[in-house]
Amino acid sequence: MFPMVTGFMNYGQQTVRAARYIGQSFMITLSHANRLPVTIQYPYEKSITSERFRGRIHFELDKCIACEVCVRVCPIDLPVVDWRLETDIRKKRLLNYSIDFGICIFCGNCVEYCPTNCLSMTEEYELSTYDRHELNYNQIALGRLPMSVIEDYTIQTILNSTQIQIVTDKPLNSRTITNS
């Protein structure tokens, strides 16, 4: 008779333990119900990039002096700078400037070391294409400014968790306002 009683006691203890585990997991689920969703609906919602985000490189042709510092500091010697020496004025004349973003590692060295600040990083990160040759940007394509995510009224902008903490500490500015 005692084995039957101990069997019922073990069964009762296991039932209570299982109910406790189910209750704990249910409480965890309920605690996550109040949180904002982590995923975003990508084509219609986009995250606002941080100020130090390293996206596509923007090139200003008028400022470039063809010094080739960008080529020397690039870890993979990526920028292609073609120039010709103008003998009458003793200056280099830039003929072609191109960067292949299929190979670029977006380290930002070219932007940091450029003496004339003709290179800058943009917030554009949508560089996907079906043909890798379309990722080779010349000076004309590099000179185009991308459309800002904040200025696009068709897209709802979402703040990152670090940006939400900054917003609670600082007053709102144009980079922290979401479009509704």
UniProtKB/Swiss-Prot annotation:
It is an enzyme of class 7 (translocase). SUPFAM superfamilies: 4Fe-4S ferredoxins. Keywords: 4Fe-4S, Chloroplast, Iron, Iron-sulfur, Membrane, Metal-binding, NAD, NADP, Plastid, Plastoquinone, Quinone, Repeat, Thylakoid, Translocase. The keyword Cell wall biogenesis/degradation does not apply. Binds 2 [4Fe-4S] clusters per subunit. [4Fe-4S] cluster 2 binds at C74, C104, C107, C110. Disulfide bonds: none annotated. Residues 55-84, 95-124 form the 4Fe-4S ferredoxin-type domain. The keyword Zinc-finger does not apply. GO terms for biological process: photosynthesis, light reaction. NCBIfam families: ndhI, NuoI, PRK05888.1-3. NDH shuttles electrons from NAD(P)H:plastoquinone, via FMN and iron-sulfur (Fe-S) centers, to quinones in the photosynthetic chain and possibly in a chloroplast respiratory chain. The immediate electron acceptor for the enzyme in this species is believed to be plastoquinone. Couples the redox reaction to proton translocation, and thus conserves the redox energy in a proton gradient. HAMAP family: NDH1_NuoI. Belongs to the complex I 23 kDa subunit family. This is NAD(P)H-quinone oxidoreductase subunit I, chloroplastic.
